Curated annotation (Swiss-Prot):
PANTHER family: INDOLE PRENYLTRANSFERASE TDIB-RELATED (PTHR40627), PRENYLTRANSFERASE ASQH1-RELATED (PTHR40627:SF4). The keyword Transferase applies. L-tryptophan binds at E93. GO terms for molecular function: prenyltransferase activity. The lineage of its organism: Eukaryota, Fungi, Dikarya, Ascomycota, Pezizomycotina. Keywords: Transferase. Induction: The expression of the dibenzodioxocinones biosynthesis cluster is positively regulated by the transcription factor dibT. Pathway: Secondary metabolite biosynthesis. This is Prenyltransferase GME11375. Its EC number is 2.5.1.-. Dimethylallyl diphosphate binds at R108, K196, Y198, K266, Y268, Y436. The keyword Metal-binding does not apply. Prenyltransferase; part of the gene cluster that mediates the biosynthesis of dibenzodioxocinones such as pestalotiollide B, a novel class of inhibitors against cholesterol ester transfer protein (CEPT). The biosynthesis initiates from condensation of acetate and malonate units catalyzed by the non-reducing PKS pks8/GME11356. Pks8/GME11356 lacks a thioesterase (TE) domain, which is important to the cyclizing of the third ring of atrochrysone carboxylic acid, and the esterase GME11355 might play the role of TE and catalyzes the cyclization reaction of the C ring. It comes from Pestalotiopsis microspora.
Amino acid sequence: MNGQKDVVQVSEAWQTLSTYLPPVTADRDYWWQLTGRHVAALVEAAGYPIEKQYEALIFHYHWTVPYMGPAPKADGTPATWKSLLGLDGSPIEYSWKWNTTRSEPDVRYVTEPIGQHPGSHLDPLNQHALRELLQRFSKNMPSSDMNMSWVNHFFARLYDHDNTRYIQEAAAGSSRSTATSVQLGTEFLRRGIGFKTYFFPRKLGQVDDISISQYGASMSQLDVDETSWDARKALVEFLETNPEGKSLRPFSLAVDNVAPSQSRLKWYFHTLHTSIDSVREIMTLGGRINGIDKQLEELEDLIRVVAGLASDFPTNAEIPLPKKSDVYDQSAKDNFGELEDVLTGYLYYFDIAPGQGKLPEVKWFIPSRHYGPNDRELASALGAWMEARGRGAYNEPYMKMLHTLSAHRGLGDGKGLQTFISCLFKPSGDLDITTYLGAEAFHPGRVAKMAKPNGRSPRATLRRGDD
């Protein structure tokens, strides 16, 4: 991976579709030219069959791009709505679930669909677009593939429904009152496309995130047997009694858009604790989850690789971060406002779906955008970790894909394209490793490269019959 040059390659599927799919509007054409290339590079690098590459791109063109909002303004900043998905306000984040010795990579992305009136009295929390999109999915897809029961439940329970008061709180200085509150996950799996809905609760009069008990109340109102909540009960006990558990702060909930009996219920938390010992304590739920010593050793090694730690770095020490000016700019600080703390520390989720087991599944996230001198070196270090474990088959395709995503800048010229790296322990003993990738849609280099004298993307002036 170290010797790979910054050469951008174009996939066959992208070349074909970009030639024949008709242009629509300047805004949609901009997002298609940018993110369509990214999706094409991801699914090709992951080794998807050509028909699955076309499926992902056609889905992206017809279902995702129309909800990405206006193209950037002339100065390269978001025109109407700054999503909290990216530090710069990008409304999309990709993910690359790494191969194991027995499996191929999977590609996913998360978007924040942007409506016609985000942040206004009509739609203060920018939820209309996502709800419209889900309704359209429900009409066009088999009921076995799309179920809205839990989605509708949490929409009703995790938000207040007084738009005027949200706007009043925003006018009084609360940036959270008109900020990202829902996101849509799209999984391009080889067996088909799946969806998840992410909720970021907003309650009037609360500056901080809602409490554990408020989340608990919303879950308790689900139509499930109370005796099936073993995993949730074990987690809450850990949160209430363990020092590391007490450091965790909830900020989101996510469900699969399938029948409740098949859905995960992922509860997301943030902590400022970053020591290796704290990771061990949380991944084992304070010793409740056992038999994972080998996986913990592998995870410790991964942390040292990603964070650039020496082999003798103490396991009880907090991992140092670079200065904030090195990891995000003023626009990101303005964008996140009261949520600034979540830009550092670790994230975890716990799958506490009722009836799925006595203990939750735990996933750890490190904000990899903070670490390493640049994106190339971070990718090379992670690739070496994969290679040492017999998982290096996709290292070169991954690096080529990164070059496509970073066409606006060299991989060695900065960091932040690889936003997070996560780890989940599988019953097989494998570590599920995922790298999350930012679009950097509003990066100055990106806008300069895409811009034309008329302010439109290259396809925006072409219409049917103009040949």
